[in-house]
Amino acid sequence: AGIRQIRSGRARPGIKALIEVAGLDDLVLTTQQIAFNIAPRLNAAGRLDDMSLGVECLLAPVHSAVEQAQTLDALNQERRRIEKEMGQQALEWLPDLAAESVEDLFSVCLFDPRWHEGVIGVLAARVRAQCARPVFIFTEVDGALLKGSGRSIDGLHLRDLLVEVDRDCQGLLQKFGGHAMAAGVTIQKRDFEVFRDRLNEFAGVQLKGRSLDETVISDGLPLAFDLVTVAGLVRDHPWGQGFPAPVFDERLEVLEQKLLAGGHLRLKLLSPRFDQVLEGIFFNRDRMIESRSAHFVFKLDVNRFRGVDRPQLVITHCL
């Protein structure tokens, strides 16, 4: 009902202002655009400043909504800059980690005192995607304490893993909490190596002998790439948590590609099956596709640019 209200033009002023600063059209807004364009602007307030700024924007009257949305947009741009810088630093360390015995590396812990506390969770998710192992990213919160944010992989309950570490090494964890896929922990700075080693040890108990290669599940080949089919799939179905949008895969030819300022890759692709040129966006991809064709995994979306709707592939993997 909420997205129908937005599409009918009856959204609150703050929501309309957020849609405007994101460069979107409220009349054809999709759940994916809410997740990837609107929500990050709201979340940026809590990550870098005060989460109440997001609430105030949502409740804002007409006369102040645009200004508050612009404040959130500026915070989100700063968050993206910080995230990109931290990501480059963290990913530079991964080749060294990969050089260690793969058989003995079941988790990854990284620490840098310069990393922003509000962005370490996002960074943990990015590193996890690169190494296919549970990851904790730490930063310094004062002279003696480190705060860490973790992200896990399917089949390994991260909070339960911390419970085992805490039971084995009483006093190591100052505090911790979370759930299966994400957790937070505070430790003494002097205990970083001990935590790293114990986490790896207990993760190994559960993961030893199991393939750590990421499993990518697809619904198969799309029936078509035409606008009517894609728009019906995107706009007329209640995709969300517990009911995810379908994921497709297909080998496509790479015609053009361009790295965008935000650390994303925009592509022009050709489907030999339909002899159709397609637009694609690969979020958080900071390097080109090296081959002239590749096997892509993607979701379908509708991209509106200057009032014209076009089908778009939102790429998640290049195999």
Where are each of the predicted segments found?
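Hydrophobic helix-and-loop "lid/oligomerization" segment in the mid-to-C-terminal part
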Residues: A1-D191, P222-A224
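Mid-to-C-terminal polyanion-binding domains and interfaces
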Residues: A65-Q70, A74-L110, G143, L156, ...
